[in-house]
């Protein structure tokens, strides 16, 4: 039987990442495994899990967990708002700065080439 992903479970993982109790590689591996093994009809969960599965190549770091927590904390009735929040978020991230900062990092480094 497929396990259903729940918002509160994901929020607790995101909080652990945000507080650096989990590192980026750990939450990334968790997301890949959970996405393979679990199901959800929740569009916000899907959007957050897609972001988490792309941590290395999209250069998401622990500070980004907060916007995902905010999106998942909105009521399900406000899913459109949450999706817009997540979709617009990359536009405010300084990716060039992250590439410079993370180019020696074992997880992110391979994705930091120009």
Regions found by a protein language model. Give the residues of each.
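Acidic, Ser/Pro/Thr-rich low-complexity regulatory regions
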Residues: 1-114
